Amino acid sequence: MTSFILKRLGFAVVTLVAVLSLVFFIVRILPGDPAMVILGDQANAASIAALRTKLGLDRPMLVQYFVFLSGAVRGDWGVSMVSGRPVIAEVLSVLPNTIELTLVSLVLGVIIGVPAGVWAAVNRNRIPDIVTRVVSLLGLSAPAFVSGIVLLLVFAIALQWFPVISGGQDQSLGGRLRDLALPAVNLALIMAAYVTRVTRSAMLEVLGQDYVRTARAKGIPAGIVIWRHAMRNCLIPVITVIGLYLGILIGNSVLTEIVFNRPGLGKLIVGALTQRDYTMLQGMIVIYTLIVVLVNLITDLTYGLVDPRVQYR
């Protein structure tokens, strides 16, 4: 186990360095000059040159790269080119909102998707199965921003059950839940569609095993056979898809935050892109990469808890 964790941590470090390097050079080749964006089109050449010197943009590309890399290793991600605040402070101020939305959506998606997948598998090729497959296909086909707009039009504008703009002044528990409801449901439905299809496929495979048929032949109630015996053996593919999709879920949460005007990484990313805030973009992508790497490691370690037959090498 220890050697496995150390090996995965080594891979994580290599992945982070590769992502940091890729992000640095991609951000630098984006069109637009941060100094001109900050000062405006009316700024003179001397002011632009002075700001470029202050931001370190007049240095050679490789010098900027090694300064950025050494700072990232020390946990110093620099300061925002626009606000002048430390990047880590800017990111951490909105990160809890994105994590809150992601975790609530994840829990809702699993609560909906796992029972729906089991229900479809038990009723294979019957009406419940057909309905579940059609609904999950719709969930997979609709992009997060499209389904988000539909939810806004129906439940916020037409029915007026929820606020159009999230993150209002009402910070009570009820107000926060109302703000969170539509964005969380939007992401949870997409998550549930993935989980449903994987759970159905895994459960169908397990239900065809000899030990399941033997348990049924002994007269064990169907509910016990499915939830106590079959479910445990189909959890690994379900856990895998949850771990893999969590990274996608964070990306979709960014789009959802933009649609619902919810404070979080989404609005920060849009601002950084439009203002060519290199350091802010780099910091947010580093956070995203760290979360994905950590989730993948936790997913791998969970396999051994679910199935003792899994060996770590």
PLM region descriptions:
Residues T2-S3, V13, A89-I130, A144, ...:
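Alpha-helical transmembrane segments of integral membrane proteins
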Residues T15-F66, L159-D179:
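Hydrophobic alpha-helical transmembrane segments of membrane transport/permease proteins
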Residues A43-N44, G56-L57, R74, G78, ...:
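Residue-level marker of structural boundaries
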Residues T53-L62, R74-V87, G168-L180, L187, ...:
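Membrane-interfacial helix-loop-helix junctions in multi-pass membrane proteins
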